[in-house]
Amino acid sequence: MKAWREDYSNHRVRAVIEEYIHSTRDRALILDSLVDGLSYDELAERYSLTYEGVKDVMKKGRAALDRHY
């Protein structure tokens, strides 16, 4: 997997995530992290997940970006 790129534009990140992540919750969580900058702890509390659960969802989001950006 490519390293996360800081130069991804928010608009393009949003478009890729909205197209390739089908779960509404996962899509919202990934966008809250990547576009709005929420921490994994904040996301875990907001979405009633464990820290590890948030990491798993974020792994899917970053993989989608690596494949389709």
Predicted segments with their positions:
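Short, Lys/Arg-enriched anionic-surface-contact patches
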Residues: R5-R25
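Short amphipathic alpha helix immediately N-terminal
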Residues: H22-L38
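Conserved tyrosine-mediated DNA breakage-rejoining catalytic core shared by Y-recombinases
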Residues: M58-K59
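Helix-turn-helix DNA-binding helix
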Residues: V54-K55
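Charged, low-cysteine interdomain linkers and short loop/connector segments
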Residues: M1-A3
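C-terminal flanking helix
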Residues: R62-Y69
